[in-house]
Regions:
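Bacterial N-terminal signal peptides
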Residues: 2-13
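A general, composition-driven signal for non-globular sequence regions
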Residues: 11-12, 31, 130
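Conserved active-site segments centered on acidic
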Residues: 16-92
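Phosphate-binding/catalytic loops
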Residues: 102, 108-151
C-alpha cells in the first residue's frame, strides 16, 4: 500500500534529476552528411549543457558522411566562439544507437536500427547550411528545448 502511494506521488511529481549512479544522457545528432547540421547541434548542445551544469554530452554522425566537415559550419562555429567538436563525419553505427539516450535526425532519414530503438526524433524544420545563421538559429532553438527536458 505504501509503495503504491509513493509510486503515485512520484508519478505526479514528474521527472527528477538522475541519481548519482545514473549515466549522463548521451545524445547523437545525425544529418545527411555528418558535416554541418549535426556538427552545429553537437557544438551548441555540449556548450549549453556545460553552462547549465549538466553532464549530458553529444556526438555527431551522418547517414551518408562526407569526407570532411562543412567549411561554412566550421567558420560559423568559430565566429560564434564555439569549440569545433573533435572528429570527422562518421556513419551512425549500431554502437551509437546502443550508447545513445536520444537520437535526433536533422533533415534526414535514419537507418531502421535507430528508428526502431525508441530513442529517435526528427527535426525537419532546420534549413540547409547554405545560410549558416538560419540553420544555427533553428538548431539552437531545438537544443534549448531539449536541454529544458534534461534538467
Amino acid at each position: 500500500m505504501i509503495t503504491t502511494v509513493l509510486t503515485a506521488i512520484l508519478a505526479l511529481a514528474g521527472p527528477t534529476q538522475p541519481s548519482a549512479g545514473a549515466a549522463a544522457p548521451h545524445v547523437v545528432f545525425v544529418c545527411e552528411h555528418g558535416a554541418a547540421k549535426s556538427l552545429v547541434a553537437t557544438a551548441y548542445f555540449n556548450k549549453m549543457a556545460a553552462e547549465r551544469g549538466l553532464a549530458a554530452r553529444a556526438t555527431f554522425r551522418g547517414v551518408d558522411p562526407q569526407d570532411a566537415l562543412s567549411v561554412r559550419a566550421v567558420a560559423g562555429l568559430k565566429e560564434d566562439g564555439l569549440t569545433i567538436p573533435d572528429g570527422r563525419p562518421t556513419p551512425i553505427a549500431a554502437s551509437d544507437v546502443t550508447a545513445a539516450t536520444h537520437i535526433f535526425a536533422i533533415g534526414c532519414a535514419l537507418p531502421a536500427s535507430a528508428t526502431k530503438s525508441g530513442k529517435a526524433s526528427s527535426w525537419d524544420d532546420v534549413p540547409d547550411d547554405q545560410g549558416y545563421g538560419p540553420m544555427r538559429d533553428a538548431i539552437v532553438r531545438h537544443v534549448r528545448a531539449l536541454l529544458d527536458t534534461l534538467r
